[in-house]
Amino acid sequence: MHYPDRLRKVYDFKTGKQGHSYTAVGNTFLVKYLERLQMRCHRNLTDEQIQAEVEHYIRLARGGVVLVSPFMSPAEEAIYEAAYKERLPMVHIVNRGLDGKFIYPSGRDLTGCTDGFMLVLAPYADYSPETAAARITRSQCLDMNGYAADIASIAQKEAET
């Protein structure tokens, strides 16, 4: 089932405890779910540890928890793949702006938005060939993880029990 209306951009979309402003595309109701969990995994996990993280977070998402993350580390990317395959609810925070008439999420993010199980949030307004090609900085990574923590309603430790 496709929901083309979910491709309508929402500018100045405020959410989270701090009320940060984003450009949003997708299912904006996902930030209203009672259980939203920041998904953050260390970059240097082994294959076995990554598989354990995938199983853990997918089990939570199957139970109705919305996964909130920039999906940057290899483990987070693996969780994104598994959640996408099962069409589980996700909020994807991206490091590029979505402002501009023809700037939209691409690939699977676009499909996830139109299918209703994904919300893409862009905390940065600008989008240009320069910013699109620029390598993400550590500061941006920390900021995006901070945005995910702000949107989450469940602390990481609570979800592990």
What does each of the following model-derived ranges do?
Residues 1-161:
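Glycine-biased, small-residue-rich flexible motifs in mid-sequence functional cores and linkers
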